[in-house]
Structures are given as C-alpha cells and as structure tokens.
C-alpha cells in the first residue's frame, strides 16, 4: 500500500500553519499552535485516531484564538483529503461513542466528498481555561469543509465542559480511524456504487 501521508502549508495575513498527517501512524503528535487546550484536543484526535500528526501554527492570538483554530482546521482537512486520495479500498464510514466520566459524545463520519457538519453541543461554559468553546464548532466546520466529509458530532450529556469537549474530540478520532481503515473485502474499489467519491 502506498504511504498515506500529506503536508499542507497555509499562510495568510492572520496565520501561518503547517500540518503533516500520516493515516497509518501510531497516534504520535507534535503540536505547537500557541493554544494549549486546542493542542490537548488535537493530541486526542491523533492518539485515538491512530494517526501521526504534526501541527505548527503561528497566529494573531493577541486578538483571540479564532483565526489559528479555524486555519488549523482548514489545513488539517486539506491534509486528510490528500492523504486518503481517491478513497479506493477505504471503509468510508466511521462512528464512535466515547465517554469521559459523566460526559458522553458521539461522532459519525462519511468520507463522502460532500462537506457537511451537523453539530450539537450544549456546553455549560463559554470557556475552558482561556479557550473559547465556540471554537470547537468552528474547527470542525473548517475541517469537514476542506476534507469534503460529512460529520454528525453530538455531545449527548455531561456537566463538565472540559470533559464534554475532550470526549467529542476522542470520538472524532475513533470514528476517523474506522473510516480511513482498509476494507479488505472491497477489493480496492471506491466505496460507492457511483465508482467515485
């Protein structure tokens, strides 16, 4: 099997981002975004997704973290799409439920070629530490748009905002791991009756 890796660089007047991903990794992460809680969440995606991930980002965080988080989502989405290529032989779909103490989240993914995000999370706090919890949705919207994937992401219950967000990122990682896995029964075919995704 060919290596399923990709690197994307994105530079704007607001950020400079470099993302490298290996879909067949061991869950290792090297993260330097200047947004500590976000780095903690990206590490969950890598570890529980079984992907190796390197992210370097410098942004205008003196304003707020929005541009950095969104642009990392854009670059990561583009890197994922490049890494999985035409999706021949992939499982395509993935789903996971992940608990963290009192919190429970669900992620359901389709590497459909059609971008879409359905996001439901009623978080009890506007911030976890300094991190604005509105940016969770912004990150996943950017990622799904640029990966051309459909994602249904739901925080089903919880009281602690940190737990709720963290188990959502873990669930996304677990679902991604399943979706990008090789389907031995597919015979290398694209997982669609259309023959293309």
Curated annotation (Swiss-Prot):
InterPro entries: IGPD_sf, ImidazoleglycerolP_deHydtase, ImidazoleglycerP_deHydtase_CS, Ribosomal_Su5_D2-typ_SF. GO terms for molecular function: imidazoleglycerol-phosphate dehydratase activity. Keywords: Amino-acid biosynthesis, Cytoplasm, Histidine biosynthesis, Lyase. It is an enzyme of class 4 (lyase). It catalyses: D-erythro-1-(imidazol-4-yl)glycerol 3-phosphate = 3-(imidazol-4-yl)-2-oxopropyl phosphate + H2O. Gene3D superfamilies: Imidazole glycerol phosphate dehydratase, domain 1. One of its GO terms (biological process) is L-histidine biosynthetic process. It holds the Pfam family IGPD. GO terms for cellular component: cytoplasm. It is found in: Cytoplasm. Pathway: Amino-acid biosynthesis; L-histidine biosynthesis; L-histidine from 5-phospho-alpha-D-ribose 1-diphosphate: step 6/9. Its EC number is 4.2.1.19. HAMAP family: HisB. Belongs to the imidazoleglycerol-phosphate dehydratase family. This is Imidazoleglycerol-phosphate dehydratase. It comes from Halorhodospira halophila (strain DSM 244 / SL1) (Ectothiorhodospira halophila (strain DSM 244 / SL1)). The lineage of its organism: Bacteria, Pseudomonadati, Pseudomonadota, Gammaproteobacteria, Chromatiales.
């Amino acid at each position: 099997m060919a290596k399923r890796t990709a690197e994307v660089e994105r530079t704007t007047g607001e950020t400079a981002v470099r993302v490298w991903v290996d879909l067949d990794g061991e869950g290792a992460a090297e993260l330097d975004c200047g947004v500590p809680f976000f780095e903690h969440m990206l590490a969950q995606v890598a570890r529980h997704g079984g992907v190796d991930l390197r992210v370097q980002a410098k942004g205008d965080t003196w304003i707020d973290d929005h541009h950095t988080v969104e642009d990392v989502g854009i670059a990561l989405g583009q890197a994922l799409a490049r890494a999985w290529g035409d999706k021949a032989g992939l499982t395509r779909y993935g789903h996971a439920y992940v608990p963290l103490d009192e919190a429970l989240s669900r992620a359901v993914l389709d590497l459909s070629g059609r971008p879409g995000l359905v996001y439901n999370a009623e978080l009890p706090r506007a911030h976890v530490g300094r991190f604005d919890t509105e940016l969770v949705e912004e990150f996943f919207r950017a990622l799904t748009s640029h990966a051309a994937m459909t994602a249904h992401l739901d925080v089903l219950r919880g009281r602690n905002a940190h737990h709720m967000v963290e188990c959502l990122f873990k669930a996304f990682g677990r679902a991604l791991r399943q979706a990008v896995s090789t389907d031995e029964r597919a015979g290398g075919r694209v997982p669609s009756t259309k023959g293309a995704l």
